[in-house]
Amino acid sequence: LGVKFETNSNIEKIIVENKKAVALQINGKRIEADIILSGADYHHTETLLDKNLRQYSENYWDKKTFAPSSLLFYVGFNKKIENVSHHTLFFDSDFDVHAKDIYDEPKWPESPLFYANFPSLTDPSTAPEGMESAFFLIPLAPGIEDTEALREEYFYKIMDRFESVTGQEVRKNIIFKNSFCVKDFKSTYNSYKG
């Protein structure tokens, strides 16, 4: 087909000539293209164009309401977890209050709703025998402050509720934990406001 893929390369600019995108600037080098497609965040893609070619201003983007971001925790346990399904929703707090904290008055929710996923319940290859892999997701407003201290505070909040609802202690059985949040969505995926 004559297609050439450039991987692990950050695009610095979309080069437009005569109202047509004709090349990309990658690592200071111009790479010609017949067609340019972007699967990146719309805002980020626009920032790769010269300002006079952008369809929307920064003011436009600042006023938009975006889909939620999230705080994700990837967790490994050295035991099997009881009283959960592969997909488990913890909607034991007020949905309207959490939604308000995402869309109307963006801030960290006091009592967040969260989702827990235990892939090792249905695919044993995702954790060693007798252990469990999981991830937890808290929907958040995009663009809010993101610090390690806030992440830890919210991990403890959801673990308190998780242990209470499922009737078991699990924190002492955590052998791996990693988080991914607003800052990471921005830096990894160029997601506007994370």
Predicted segments, located by residue:
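General small-molecule cofactor/ligand-binding pocket signal
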Residues: 4-6, 175
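FAD-binding beta-loop-beta segment adjacent to the flavin cofactor pocket
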Residues: 14, 123-131, 183-194
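Conserved FAD/dinucleotide-binding core of flavoprotein oxidoreductases
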Residues: 43, 47, 128-161
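A glycine-rich dinucleotide-binding beta-alpha-beta segment and adjacent secondary-structure elements
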Residues: 109-115, 168-194
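C-terminal substrate/ligand-recognition segments
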Residues: 163, 167
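Residues within well-ordered alpha helices
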Residues: 1, 161-162
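Active-site/ligand-binding neighborhood in enzyme catalytic cores
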Residues: 1, 8, 191-194
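Mid-domain catalytic core of redox enzymes
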Residues: 3, 10-127
